[in-house]
Amino acid sequence: MVTGKTGVLDIINSGSAMELDEQTLCMIEQVVKEKNIHTLWFEAHYMYRHKLQAFAARFAPATVKFRCGIESFDPLLRSSWRKGVGEKVTPADVAKYFHGVCLLCCTQGDSKVRILNDIALAKEHFEYFSV
């Protein structure tokens, strides 16, 4: 249940906001208005980075923030997972478009060093991250 108490609404799905159906988006718009939501969080794939502003405009005057499921800043590891984010994409590149990231850890062959490095980079470049 959305109360609007904090004025922040985090839309959690395991896909991209741009892939939500029209009925769901209309429902979110209605909740934003009715509950006086001033800040919305959505997840979106990096491939949608050039569509974020247009999508966010739909929910004005609320501020819309996006997080990206980048999984890791290790380019070779990320590439091996075939998530569609190129090896040359840096944390700074992602931060140009996204306010937060979702990191994946404890996969086969993972290391404490890699996880801690990803966390350090997330702290440096983003206002939000989840592991």
Predicted ranges, named:
Residues 21-25, 52-53, 112-116:
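Conserved strand-to-helix beginnings and helix N-cap segments that scaffold or border functional pockets
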Residues 33-35, 57-61, 95, 123-125:
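Short, conserved loop/helix-junction motifs that constitute active-site signature segments
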Residues 107-125:
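Catalytic cores of alpha/beta
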Residues 2-22, 32-51, 62-89, 100-107, ...:
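Core AdoMet radical
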Residues 30-31, 55, 117-122:
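A generic secondary-structure signal
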